[in-house]
Structure formats: structure tokens, C-alpha cells
């Protein structure tokens, strides 16, 4: 099957594809890339956020911790996950699993597809800002490799909380930005209908972000899930092999230097 990018797409088209119904799901990625996945639930404080799937799996025969944002497929599931927008319990669950991975010296792989953190009243009352900030602080110094893959929307701090790893990759039909094009257009021009124009200005596409060294590479997409999973596996194998060679102190120093560039 041909790549989705046979013809160069506009930023607006890439945004539409990142949000599209054909986008591979969290569950499909788990089944296609990893073996023996064991899901772990709860943040050990308050709740288990369905917008975050996390647990332990095998990748190429070795244990890894996997964390994915989950938009859901059915209408009922999407309501339960707030369309993939995590609550504080989701960020705290992910951090619990990352600290567990550090304890057992397992690398961490995150897959991100979220418009951003859930903005509801309950999230604010339960410390949404603190939960995101805690993830950023703790992951910056965790002593195991953290590989992040944005496979759809990468929205604001809600996405950054999972993408502050050693290596960040994007699917070719994905986006990564501080806010949505609609939000950008509404703030800058007081006209959300100019979202397509905003998408071009924001430089939120994988190609632009790679040029600016915000990300480390682009994963080609295909309508064939088997081909897509092979591409993901190739990248993960390459990146894990690279970062597992480093000592814990070198790993943390390199990660912190990466983000100090910005």
C-alpha cells in the first residue's frame, strides 16, 4: 500500500489526518508492536483514568513499560476517556508506572494522541497543573530510557507530559503544538474559522518540527497496519539499543540537555 504522503500535504490536511477516524488506535498499537501486555491500573491515590492505558509488555523478547493515551473507539468509551484527554489520575498513573520501570530497570515507551489535558472542573479541583508539572519534573531525571511517539494529536502540556523523553518521534500524519489551530486562530485573529491558515503559521507538522530539531524522526504511515507496525518496531529497536548503552548519569544529562535547547 502507498504511503499517505505520496503527495505533499498541507498542514491543515495533516491536522485532519491526525484527528481522523482511520488513525490507528492505542489498542491496535499494543497488539501490533508488543507481546504479553499486562495492564496495570490506578494512580494509588484516587482513581484509574481510562484515557491512559499503561502496563508491562515484551518488546523483542525484553520487558518494557508501555504508556498510551487512549481516545477510545465507541461513543461510550470516548465519553469515558474525555476523547483522550487525561485527568490528573491519568498523569499520576503514568508517573507511577514510570517510577516502577526505573525501579526494575525497564525502558519506557509512550504513545501520544491527545488534544490536551482534560480542562473540566473536576480536573482542576484534583490538581491538573500539578500532575502535569510533576510528570515533567520526574521524567526529566528518571534513570531509564524514555522513548516517545506522537501518533495523532500532540496537544499542549497534556502531550508534553508524556513526550519529555530521550527521543521523540512522530507519525507522518500527526501534529504537535502548544494549542489547537482553532484556538490559535481565535486568540490571534479572533476568528476560529481561520484554523487552516493557523495550522500553516504554527509549523506543527512533523516535517517542520524535525527541521527545528524538536523531534528526532518521522515514522512513515501506511494503510497496512502490518507495514506500520514494522516501521514502529524498527524505530523502537534502534532507539532503545542506542539509549540502553548509556550509563544512568549520561542518560539523564543527555535528556536534560535536549530540553534545555528550547
Language model segments and positions:
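Terminal-region recognition feature
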Residues: 1-186, 190, 200-262
Amino acid at each position: 500500500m502507498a504511503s499517505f504522503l505520496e503527495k505533499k500535504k498541507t498542514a491543515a490536511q495533516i491536522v485532519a489526518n491526525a484527528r481522523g477516524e482511520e488513525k490507528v488506535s492505542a489498542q491496535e498499537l499494543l497488539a501490533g508492536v508488543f507481546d504479553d501486555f499486562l495492564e496495570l491500573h490506578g494512580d494509588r491515590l484516587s482513581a484509574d483514568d481510562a484515557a491512559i492505558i499503561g502496563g508491562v509488555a515484551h518488546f523483542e523478547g525484553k520487558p518494557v513499560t508501555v504508556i498510551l493515551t487512549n481516545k477510545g473507539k465507541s461513543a461510550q468509551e470516548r465519553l469515558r476517556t474525555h476523547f483522550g484527554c487525561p485527568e490528573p489520575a491519568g498523569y499520576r498513573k503514568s508517573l507511577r508506572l514510570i517510577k516502577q520501570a526505573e525501579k526494575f530497570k525497564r525502558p519506557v515507551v509512550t504513545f501520544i494522541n491527545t488534544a490536551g489535558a482534560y480542562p473540566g472542573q473536576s480536573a482542576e479541583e484534583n490538581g491538573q497543573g500539578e500532575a502535569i508539572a510533576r510528570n515533567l519534573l520526574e521524567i526529566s531525571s528518571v534513570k531509564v530510557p524514555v522513548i516517545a511517539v506522537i501518533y495523532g494529536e500532540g496537544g499542549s502540556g497534556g502531550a508534553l507530559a508524556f513526550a519529555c523523553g530521550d527521543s521523540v518521534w512522530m507519525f507522518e500524519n500527526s501534529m504537535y503544538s502548544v494549542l489547537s489551530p482553532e484556538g490559535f486562530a481565535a486568540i490571534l485573529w479572533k476568528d476560529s474559522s481561520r484554523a487552516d491558515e493557523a495550522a500553516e503559521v504554527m509549523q506543527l507538522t512533523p516535517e517542520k518540527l524535525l527541521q527545528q530539531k524538536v523531534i528526532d524522526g518521522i515514522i512513515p504511515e501506511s494503510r497496512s497496519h502490518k507495514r506500520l507496525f514494522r516501521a514502529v518496531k524498527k524505530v523502537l529497536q534502534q532507539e532503545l539499543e542506542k539509549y540502553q548503552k548509556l550509563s544512568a548519569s549520561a542518560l539523564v544529562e543527555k535528556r536534560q540537555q535536549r530540553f534545555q535547547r528550547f
